[in-house]
Amino acid sequence: MKILLVEDNNILAKGLIYSLEQKQYNVVHKLNIQETINYLIYNRPSLIILDISLPDGNGFELYTQKIKPQKIPTIFLTAKDDEDDIVKGLELGADDYITKP
């Protein structure tokens, strides 16, 4: 299973990648929206773990415009334990959410 991790915090990303690879998942890491869009042109991951807040834009918009139409399962990743963001992500169609430690 190939997982695309979209996260701009390298320390957090390294921890997530390590944990997922220990479970035998193949993880591809992208730092921002543009890298993610470029990757999705030629690749289709089995799952996307997507940060809501990225340096070049909003994860919700990326999901709505580029990911949801491809029907790729997505889990939002958020630093904020903000119920509004969680509800918004789930209402948009995300499969789940994770709050950052």
Task: Give a label for each model feature.
Residues 1-101:
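N-terminal/domain-start alpha-helical segments
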